[in-house]
């Protein structure tokens, strides 16, 4: 729609004529807030030699900015306030709010305090703001004690429980527990679980890197006798069920083990270290089986109450076995942990018989259940989790057990798959008392739970609770509009995104749980607009480095135990992830850490396909509606993007010769793509399908003089498809953006709000609460997932197109915001916010009586370039709040 706007009023404490917001005196003072070390608030166990420090400003004045800053670091907070005891300081005349430590080598196991002071646009100094961080192990040699295990065979189904009593001789000032495990663990002190983490530590290539976790346990220890307990789970380390992804053949596979160091500081200045060794006792506990894909078996008759307290008699327990470290590279898990973040009670309960019940929680997600029950001793109960009901909607339909074991030619060591090894099914044996069960070392993807038993049970809604489990990334964005369908789609996208964050990005939380690289890079923008995910993705890029072969090849799932081929349009995650982090955060660290990996992988493809086109080794536009896009075209576009990102990264990092070489290669690949696939007369790529037209437009392949033609062909094609989607996951990433960027946002909006097949809305109309794996709802009967994130770009589009919050490629980290709100005809209002590295960006508009009011908040230190309705004359804005009212449509 070609609209002209009349500017009637531009207000909120400022007058804009020339495009500048004048600074206002006396309204507020500048103050540094949200201080972070390594993008975390007051983190423990930092092991980076040169940690990063960041902050943003709190200042209500329009035009607020930081002209300069001073950062100081020391070990005494009181002294630091007086500018004393400074170990390192940095003062710069700069508006940057991210810097890196450049002082003397930090000491291990030390709490450091750091402060930030800034000078504002009027050269007035702010108050000093102080935060802290603690270092952990700065090299593996600093670990004491030994890894310990129960010494059982890797196929043993028993879950080991470890315990030890120890004496602290003095009054405790502070204490830290450092624990690293090959497998999963639950740590307790004096009968209390340590921390609120779940499924720790995160999945890695265990032969290349182990993660340790740090806890403040000061309040859990005391002078005198204490007790420590550890339960070990198999996790991703020891896959016992045979599966088609060959994790049971992973080179790292072994019996789980752990190493524990507890550092205790006494009030008199002395210290002790409690370590794991053969003095720990071990026994098999009530968890009789645990597997990350399958579930847990729990026998309440085998419980030993108080096993992790001082009063327990462990005389029948055996001595733990000291084992060698599974890996020489042990690093800190410096990211947000997996946690329980939300719970739900059932929305319905169907009693099908006195031994069969069906719970519906009304929301599909990744998680676990807590089940409270009382039954006759020895009663066997199965909790079968799933996301789909059968055609009569009375029983749970779940084809995942077949999916999990399909194509498997070999049996388990003990001959056959045990009858209780059913996918996503916990199995319990009751002891006649009131029993409460919740798994420790497993999670599922589900909405429904079918409870079956071999003896009658009387159950109500109160017997079961569902918990949402995922990497607990902080919320960074919000979105709301007048269309309830779009609001539901935004929520469904977020549930799918979070359901697939478990220390690494997965495709789905129920069946595969695999780190498919393509799904992850396609959904990344959606994730980062709504959630602060930098620490999560930086960890996953370390997984990329660990999983790379000497020739630069990567597997299509990461981490991988060896399964998976090299797939060019998937493994481009190695360049897209670091580059997208740089765009969102303005932080080059991930690019620096991964440059050699990015370069090596790109060189692998350049050598394998010297002509510039990827002719095989690709998956293409996965699961399209009907039209199958040319895979050589789509894969070659991602090949171009790989090379282009390496070129841009080389330029940023000052590698001139690399920059020139890869820039030349990128242009050569682009030219080759256009020569083979573009008809310049018609503006059609390949067959002219939606994906084949939108991908070249979105990824910058189309020659400047052909953009209009290609855009016209795209909108024509979409019109022929009745404004419906005809794409797979690659086209899903680009179709809405390409339409919007070429002036066809109304058509994109119509596509988004369709509710018949194929569409996002159709999934919700069919009862979905997350995004699906297949456009065809009926295809779910073939085992397709109802909780996949690969079609999730729509979530980012809400922010970019409707609210208009966009990255400026020339100024990363939202230093300058490209504001392109589109006032689509069928919406009455849009409200969105995004917490950028500079602070909160707010963009909202309302339509009243045919006129639009638009309001934007630009955080201190940032600027914006505004295009009303996504086009027209650019308006330059500085920080503050700006309102446009009475924008009229002709």
Predicted region positions:
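Bacterial Sec-dependent N-terminal signal peptides
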Residues: 1-30
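Extracellular/oxidizing-compartment recognition motifs
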Residues: 26-510, 518-519, 535-538, 554-560, ...
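Active-site-proximal structural scaffolding
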Residues: 48, 126, 159, 180, ...
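Conserved, charged catalytic cores of large soluble enzymes
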Residues: 134-138, 197, 617, 637-652
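Active-site acid/base region of carbohydrate-active enzymes
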Residues: 184, 259, 275-284, 448, ...
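Active/binding-pocket-proximal capping segment
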Residues: 185, 194-196, 200-201, 544, ...
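C-terminal capping/lid segments that line or modulate ligand- or cofactor-binding pockets
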Residues: 228, 298-299, 512, 530, ...
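Non-catalytic C-terminal accessory modules of carbohydrate-active enzymes
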Residues: 250-263, 271-306, 311, 331-342, ...
């Amino acid at each position: 729609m070609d609209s002209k706007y009349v500017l009637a009023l531009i207000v909120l404490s400022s007058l804009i004529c020339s495009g500048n917001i004048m600074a206002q005196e006396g309204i507020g003072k500048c103050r540094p807030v949200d201080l972070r070390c390594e993008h975390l608030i007051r983190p423990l166990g930092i092991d980076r030699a040169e940690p990063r420090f960041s902050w943003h400003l709190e200042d209500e004045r329009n035009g607020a900015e930081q002209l300069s800053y001073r950062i100081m670091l020391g070990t005494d907070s009181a002294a630091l306030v007086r500018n004393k005891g400074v170990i390192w300081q940095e003062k710069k005349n700069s508006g940057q709010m991210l810097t890196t430590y450049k002082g003397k080598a930090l000491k291990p196991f030390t709490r450091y305090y750091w402060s930030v002071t800034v000078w504002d646009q009027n050269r007035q100094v702010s108050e000093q703001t102080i935060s802290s961080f603690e270092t952990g192990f700065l090299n593996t040699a600093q670990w004491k004690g030994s890894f310990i295990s129960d010494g059982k065979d890797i196929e043993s189904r028993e879950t080991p429980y470890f315990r030890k009593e120890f004496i602290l001789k003095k009054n405790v000032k502070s204490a830290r527990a450092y624990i690293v495990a090959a497998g999963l663990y639950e740590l307790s002190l004096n009968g209390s679980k340590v921390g609120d983490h779940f499924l720790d530590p995160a999945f890695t290539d265990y032969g290349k890197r182990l993660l340790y976790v740090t806890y403040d346990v000061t309040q859990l220890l005391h002078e005198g006798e204490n007790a420590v307990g550890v339960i070990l789970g198999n996790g991703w380390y020891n896959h016992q069920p045979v599966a088609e992804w060959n994790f049971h053949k992973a080179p790292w596979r072994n019996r789980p083990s752990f190493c524990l160091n507890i550092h205790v500081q006494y009030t008199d200045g002395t210290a002790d270290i409690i370590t794991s060794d053969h003095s720990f006792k071990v026994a098999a506990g009530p968890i009789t089986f645990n597997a990350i894909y399958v579930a847990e078996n729990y026998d309440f008759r085998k419980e030993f109450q108080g096993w992790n307290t001082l009063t327990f008699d462990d005389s029948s327990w055996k001595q733990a076995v000291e084992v060698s470290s599974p890996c020489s590279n042990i690093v800190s898990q410096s990211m947000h942990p997996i946690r329980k973040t939300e719970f739900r009670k059932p929305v319905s309960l169907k009693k099908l018989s006195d031994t069969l019940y069906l719970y519906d929680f009304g929301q599909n997600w990744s998680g676990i259940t807590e089940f409270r029950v009382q039954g006759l001793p020895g009663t066997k109960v199965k909790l079968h989790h799933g996301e789909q009901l059968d055609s009569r909607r009375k029983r749970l339909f779940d084809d995942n057990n077949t999916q999990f074991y399909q194509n498997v030619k070999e049996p388990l060591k003990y001959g056959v798959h045990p009858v209780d090894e059913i996918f996503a099914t916990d199995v319990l044996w009751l002891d006649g008392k009131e029993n409460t069960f919740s798994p420790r070392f497993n999670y599922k993807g589900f909405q429904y739970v079918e409870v079956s038993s071999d003896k009658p049970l009387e159950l109500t809604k109160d017997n079961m609770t569902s918990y949402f489990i995922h990497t607990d990334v902080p919320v960074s964005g919000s979105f709301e509009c007048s269309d309830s369908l779009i609001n539901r789609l935004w929520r469904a996208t977020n549930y799918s995104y979070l359901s697939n964050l478990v220390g690494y990005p997965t495709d789905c939380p129920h069946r595969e749980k695999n780190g498919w690289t393509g799904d992850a890079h396609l959904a990344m923008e959606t994730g980062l607009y709504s959630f602060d995910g930098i620490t999560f993705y930086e960890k996953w890029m370390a997984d990329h480095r660990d999983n790379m072969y000497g020739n630069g090849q990567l597997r299509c799932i990461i981490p991988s135990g060896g399964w998976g081929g090299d797939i060019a349009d998937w493994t481009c995650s190695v360049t897209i992830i670091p580059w997208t982090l740089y765009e969102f955060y303005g932080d080059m660290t991930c690019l620096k850490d991964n440059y050699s990996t990015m370069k090596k992988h790109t060189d692998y493809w350049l050598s394998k396909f010297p002509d510039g086109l990827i002719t095989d080794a690709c998956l293409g536009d996965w699961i399209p509606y009907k039209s199958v896009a040319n895979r050589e075209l789509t894969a070659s576009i991602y090949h171009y993007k790989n090379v282009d990102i390496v070129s841009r990264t080389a330029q940023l990092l000052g590698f001139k010769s690399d920059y020139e070489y890869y820039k030349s290669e990128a242009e050569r690949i682009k030219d080759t793509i256009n020569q083979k696939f573009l008809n310049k007369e018609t503006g059609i790529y390949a067959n002219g399908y939606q994906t084949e037209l939108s991908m070249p437009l979105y990824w910058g392949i189309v020659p400047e003089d052909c953009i209009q033609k290609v855009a016209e062909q795209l909108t024509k094609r979409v019109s022929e498809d009745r404004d419906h989607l005809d794409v797979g996951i690659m086209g899903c990433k680009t179709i809405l953006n390409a339409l919007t960027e070429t002036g066809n946002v109304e058509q994109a909006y119509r596509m988004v709000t369709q509710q018949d097949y194929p569409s996002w809305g159709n999934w919700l109309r069919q009862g979905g609460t997350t995004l699906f794996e297949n456009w065809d709802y009926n295809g779910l009967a073939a085992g397709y997932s109802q909780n996949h994130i690969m079609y999730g770009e729509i979530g980012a589009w809400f922010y970019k197109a409707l609210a208009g919050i966009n990255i400026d490629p020339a100024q990363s980290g939202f230093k300058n915001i490209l504001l392109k709100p589109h006032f689509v005809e069928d919406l009455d209002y849009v409200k969105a916010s995004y917490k950028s590295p500079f602070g909160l960006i707010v963009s909202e508009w309302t339509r009243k009586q045919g006129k639009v009011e638009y309001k934007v908040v630009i955080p201190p230190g940032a600027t914006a370039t505004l295009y009303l309705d996504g086009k027209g004359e650019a308006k330059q804005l500085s920080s503050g709040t700006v309102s446009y009212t009475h924008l009229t449509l002709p």
